[in-house]
């Protein structure tokens, strides 16, 4: 039985939890060897029994049978396509149509958003928002795709009146870090949590008495250990992959939550500043 095909064809009939399971299995099919029903249930925020019932609905006796069948289907598919198709990104290959690529990318991003939001500690997030709101000065650090996420957050925060530095040059990042003071905040964005440039800046910020907030993965990392607060992001991408699409999606979901939370704390004045910004930029057209 071709379970992957069956999953795709039955998507319109799935309940909310069943759709979560289907999306996970399709996005993570290449990694199912290391996935248990318990681990999957925790990541998706559902019960193990829901996963077993989903497997049975597809005709398998349980999750183990479904998992092994999917692994076999994936391996057979890879053997068939390896001779002609190049592996481009995640589950996307060079012989996928644009429509298939769009579906795969959409599923990957949705999964990153769902898992990140499901695993966030919202009490901790609220505390972090309060800490940022009181900071005289905020520094945001990041490299590559994480730097783009940081730059976007910096623009949003400046729009509502916060003093923010977000420089792409790592030497400038380090220079700003050593000048931070007690009460200031450094937001360090790094999925791996192991980039030496980001760690150097975090160490300098801590030494100066600033509060370090890390937006990083669940992996135990040097940055996680350095930070006063962490906000976890979940992505299906690994260190060797050439792009960080779902990682940026997960990071942006967290930074957008920070921004909206800060707007809420000072909603009237924040909305006035956003409106003034809009009026000014309209005059530039």
UniProtKB/Swiss-Prot annotation:
Q: In which pathway does it act?
A: Amino-sugar metabolism; N-acetylmuramate degradation [regulation]
The UniProt entry, under Pfam families, shows: HTH_6, SIS
Set out the biological process GO terms recorded for this chain's protein.
Answer: carbohydrate derivative metabolic process; N-acetylmuramic acid catabolic process; negative regulation of DNA-templated transcription; regulation of carbohydrate catabolic process
The UniProt entry, under InterPro entries, shows: Homeodomain-like_sf (IPR009057), HTH_RpiR (IPR000281), RpiR-like (IPR047640), RpiR-like_SIS (IPR035472), SIS_dom (IPR001347), SIS_dom_sf (IPR046348), Tscrpt_reg_HTH_MurR (IPR022821), WH-like_DNA-bd_sf (IPR036388)
Domain SIS residues, every copy: 128-268
The family database entries (PROSITE patterns) matched by this protein are listed as: HTH_RPIR (PS51071), SIS (PS51464)
Which CDD domains does the UniProt record give?
SIS_RpiR (cd05013)
Query: Can you provide one Gene Ontology molecular function annotated for this UniProt record?
Result: carbohydrate derivative binding
Keywords tagged on the record: Carbohydrate metabolism, DNA-binding, Repressor, Transcription, Transcription regulation
Q: What does the function comment of this entry state?
A: Represses the expression of the murPQ operon involved in the uptake and degradation of N-acetylmuramic acid (MurNAc). Binds to two adjacent inverted repeats within the operator region. MurNAc 6-phosphate, the substrate of MurQ, is the specific inducer that weakens binding of MurR to the operator.
Q: How does it assemble?
A: Homotetramer.
Report the protein name in the record: HTH-type transcriptional regulator MurR
């Amino acid at each position: 039985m071709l379970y992957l095909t069956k999953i795709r064809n039955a998507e319109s009939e799935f309940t909310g939890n069943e759709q979560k399971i289907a999306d996970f299995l399709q996005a993570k099919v290449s990694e199912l060897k290391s996935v248990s029903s318990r681990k999957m249930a925790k990541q998706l925020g559902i019960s193990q029994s829901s996963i077993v019932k989903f497997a049975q609905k597809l005709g398998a006796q349980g999750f183990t049978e479904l998992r092994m069948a999917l692994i076999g289907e994936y391996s057979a598919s890879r053997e068939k396509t390896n001779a002609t198709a190049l592996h481009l990104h995640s589950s996307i290959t060079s012989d996928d149509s644009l429509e298939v690529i769009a579906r795969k990318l959409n599923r990957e991003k949705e999964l990153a958003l769902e898992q990140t939001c499901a695993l966030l500690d919202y009490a901790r997030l609220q505390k972090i928002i309060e800490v940022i709101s009181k900071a005289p000065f905020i520094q945001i650090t990041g490299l590559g795709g994480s730097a783009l996420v940081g730059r976007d957050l910096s623009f949003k925060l400046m729009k509502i009146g916060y003093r923010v530095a977000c420089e792409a040059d790592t030497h400038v990042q380090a220079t700003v870090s050593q000048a931070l003071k007690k009460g200031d905040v450094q937001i360090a964005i790094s999925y791996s949590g192991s980039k030496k440039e980001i760690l150097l800046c975090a160490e300098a910020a801590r030494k100066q008495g600033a509060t370090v907030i890390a937006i990083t993965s669940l992996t135990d990392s040097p940055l996680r250990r350095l930070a006063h607060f962490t906000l976890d992001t979940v992505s299906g991408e690994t260190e060797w992959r050439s792009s960080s699409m779902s990682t940026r999606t997960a990071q942006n979901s967290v930074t957008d939550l920070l921004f909206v939370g800060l707007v809420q704390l000072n909603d009237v004045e924040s909305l006035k500043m956003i409106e003034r910004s809009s009026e000014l930029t309209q005059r530039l057209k």
